[in-house]
Amino acid sequence: LLAENFPFSTWSRLLRHTISEKQQLLLTQSPTAGVAPLRQAIANHLRHFRGMDISPEQIVIGAGTEYLYELLIKLIGRDKIYCVEDPGYQKLRRIYRDNGACCIALPIDQQGMSVTALNTVSCDVIHISPSHHFPTGIITPISRRYELLGWAAAGPRYIIEDDYDTEFRLVGRPIPSLFSIDMSNKVIYMNTFSKSLASTIRISYMVLPKPLMEEFNNKLNYLSCTVS
């Protein structure tokens, strides 16, 4: 992002307004999952842009997706087997392994990760980017998305849906997110503002299914929010 393309005048105006009008909020410690106004704004955005009918209380905010990945490993468990896409985001494998979790890289086909490949290994959690796979750009069709949801619903499994780069399209609207069509509370949705605003703005978020959010509040409420 070039400096001349960033709306610094608008950014400065909003900062001045916030400092002037939200002084008490700025001096109040954020809850573990993040400040309520930001979570509400994200919920409104996802409802409008991604058709996700969610509560702000399901949203967890963190300083970068790497931090949120580590939270998920703490929440779901280091004893689980995590599968990632091959090819894919190389840093993911290191994050899982450095946090003591078993990570398997599964080859993808022309529609993304397949249930056929998943059935060849023992796997508890898959981590995928169905709306814009990196580095191939593959978009997982709706039929494959339902197959993956069926896989997750068949056992104690989860899908981590990284909705990377979905804001940028030449025409039309994106295919519905896995989270928005999931009926079994098995999808964890993740996104970040580093692409839509700037890479130096380290604000990312995840949306947890309600049962998993309850577990998050019980297990990880001692942590401080990394975004203030």
Question: Where in the sequence are the language-model features?
Answer:
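Short catalytic/ligand-binding loop motif for oxyanion handling, primarily in non-cytosolic enzymes
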Residues: A3-P7, F134-T136, E167-F168, S199
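Conserved N-terminal helix/loop that builds the PLP phosphate-binding region
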Residues: L1-K22
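PLP-dependent aminotransferase class I/II
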Residues: I188-S228
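Walker B catalytic acidic pair
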Residues: D162-D163
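Conserved core of the PLP fold type I
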Residues: L15-P156, T166-F168, R173-I181, I188
